[in-house]
Curated annotation (Swiss-Prot):
Gene: bchN
Species annotation: Chlorobaculum tepidum (strain ATCC 49652 / DSM 12025 / NBRC 103806 / TLS)
GO terms for MF: 4 iron, 4 sulfur cluster binding; ATP binding; metal ion binding; oxidoreductase activity, acting on iron-sulfur proteins as donors; oxidoreductase activity, acting on the CH-CH group of donors, iron-sulfur protein as acceptor
Superkingdom of origin: Bacteria
Keyword Amino-acid biosynthesis (UniProt): no
Catalytic activity field: chlorophyllide a + oxidized 2[4Fe-4S]-[ferredoxin] + 2 ADP + 2 phosphate = protochlorophyllide a + reduced 2[4Fe-4S]-[ferredoxin] + 2 ATP + 2 H2O
UniProt keyword annotations, A-Z: 4Fe-4S, ATP-binding, Bacteriochlorophyll biosynthesis, Chlorophyll biosynthesis, Iron, Iron-sulfur, Metal-binding, Nucleotide-binding, Oxidoreductase, Photosynthesis
Protein name: Light-independent protochlorophyllide reductase subunit N
Length: 419
């Protein structure tokens, strides 16, 4: 479906203020319960994962870092055989994902050859490009799913089922499956599934329903290699997106449904939240690649979206979201310094931004929402509507409950020079 000519995308050239791709381990190791994620990286990678994911070593999580030391610089390839054997003894995984990071990529480590060398028939080792030089933290999920594609069975022609593409927790997955079955849509499974040996069969008559907005590459690959159809719709966030998503998906199976009443009831359920959002100026900086559907929900909830920026926009994959953002300033790969000037000039009521930039904004008196929270919470479909709305209004309510900022009180005894 062509993008509306009214939706203008401004392309800039700045770096992404985001976590690197290794952060995807945080939710994927919990989703794929018989997996292990091994990162070949430095002490920086190890500190990042332990602190960002809040895991202690004695908890024996199903991820780890094989540290590159100075001695490794003189070797042709890192020696990981002993590490792999230890992982197998301690965790007995069905699959091991070998993730790249910045330093070994600069060293030109042959990850594909290394993964092939370490693989066995019983426990394949799959290379996942996840370096922060190329990917932000949500895009690396796309890399993990692409690594799984060769292990998805071939579905025969004529077997028309939907496969939901994107990692969600088991409760959300059950909700999506139940909703589809109630609408008469046959479900083939999820990519990824909770176990490596339960990957869905995908073939020429499979309908791929992406439920995360950062998975364009794996959907394109399955369309190209398996001939699968890819649903082009809004993503199932908010009453508006959920209604359109299910109606469009049903239509691909020849089922006509009208979910207007259900969407209206969902809007009514979150009326206290949307009343608070109406008229509020909200600015979304680039971070998670979820910005387009989040901005669309805010717009339909009555907020004024000052700017919606994202690290990467695929005009085909995001076509429906872009059409729904008619009249909104949409920026790809935004220049953060330019954004700072616009934020100072427009003084938005709330900024949805990364953890890196959140505290400086707060220090300058702005209300901030961490964009990363939207990747970790259950905000999909009808069951996620209330959670999604609450995520946006919680910082507004928190600011209302706080006393007025009194600089002298905050600085008393801390900065004598300021007295």
């Amino acid at each position: 479906m062509p993008v509306s000519s009214d939706c203008q995308i401004l392309k800039e050239d700045n770096v992404t203020h985001s976590f690197c791709g290794l952060a995807c381990v945080g939710w994927l190791y919990q989703k794929i319960k018989d997996s292990f994620f091994l990162i070949l990286g430095t002490h920086t990678c190890a500190h990042f994962l332990q602190n960002a994911l809040g895991m202690m070593i004695f908890a024996k999580p199903r991820f780890g870092v094989a540290l590159i030391e100075e001695a490794d610089l003189s070797r042709a390839e890192p020696q990981l055989e002993a590490v792999i054997e230890e992982i197998k003894r301690d965790h007995n995984p069905s699959v091991i994902f070998l993730l790249s990071s910045c330093t070994p990529e600069v060293m030109k480590v042959d990850f594909k050859g290394l993964a092939h060398h370490l693989s066995t028939d019983k426990t394949p080792v799959l290379f996942v490009p996840a370096s922060g030089l190329v990917f932000n933290f949500t895009q690396a999920e796309d890399s993990v799913l692409q690594a799984l594609v060769p292990f998805c069975p071939e579905a025969p022609a004529g077997e028309k089922k939907v496969v939901f593409v994107g990692s969600v927790n088991d409760i959300t997955a059950d909700d999506l499956r139940t909703e589809a079955e109630q609408l008469g849509i046959p479900v083939g499974g999820f990519l990824p599934e909770s176990r490596f040996d339960k990957l869905p069969a995908i073939g020429p008559d499979t309908v791929l329903a992406p439920i995360q907005p950062y998975l364009s590459r794996v959907c394109s690959r399955l369309n190209r290699e398996r001939g699968s159809q890819v649903l082009t719709s809004l993503f199932p966030f908010g009453p508006d997106g959920t209604k359109t998503f299910w109606e469009d998906l049903a239509a691909m199976f020849g089922i006509k449904v009208d979910l207007s009443d259900r969407a209206e009831a969902a809007w009514e359920k979150i009326k206290p939240q949307t009343d608070l959002l109406k008229g509020k100026k909200i600015f979304l900086t680039a971070d998670t690649m979820m910005e387009l559907p989040l901005a669309r929900f805010l717009k339909n909830a009555g907020a004024e979206v000052v700017e919606c920026s994202s690290a990467y926009i695929n005009k085909k994959f995001h076509a429906r979201e872009l059409e729904a953002l008619e009249g909104v300033k949409v920026v790809e790969q935004p220049n953060f310094h330019r954004q700072l000037e616009e934020i100072r000039a427009t003084r938005p009521d709330m900024i949805v931004t990364s953890l890196m930039t959140a505290n400086p904004f707060v220090g300058n008196g702005f209300i901030v929402k961490w964009s990363m929270e939207f990747t970790l919470m259950s905000i999909h479909s009808w069951s996620g509507v209330f959670t999604l709305a609450n995520l946006f209004v919680s910082p507004l309510l928190r600011r209302e409950s706080l006393p007025e900022f009194d600089e002298s009180v905050w600085l008393e005894g801390v900065m004598p020079s300021a007295q």
